[in-house]
Regions:
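Ribonuclease/tRNase effector modules and their secretory precursors
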Residues: 1-88
Length: 88
């Protein structure tokens, strides 16, 4: 997937995506790695949003839940580490 823009909320926004990812131990950089090099994209069964699966440079397997704003822009909602066999 190639997106030209990834929208991040302010770091100190308690309801923002930066903080939500951080609560799961995932950094913005890791989310961007997965979105730029996703191994699989599917739909979440719980939210219906698109999810991207991929590995970080550190070897973590992450699931990133996101919203497509347009063809070039995404808004990551949350992200967390998942076992490789888990599906949305």
């Amino acid at each position: 997937m190639l997106y030209r823009a990834i929208i991040w909320d302010l770091d100190d926004d308690p309801d923002g995506n930066v903080r939500h990812c951080a609560e799961h131990g995932v950094t913005q950089e890791e989310v961007e790695e997965v979105l730029e090099n996703a191994q699989d994209v599917d739909l979440s069964r719980s939210s219906g949003r698109p999810v991207a699966f991929g590995d970080t440079a550190a070897g973590r397997h992450l699931m990133v839940v996101f919203e497509e704003i347009d063809d070039d822009t995404v808004y990551p909602v949350t992200a967390y580490e998942v076992p490789r066999r888990q599906r949305p």
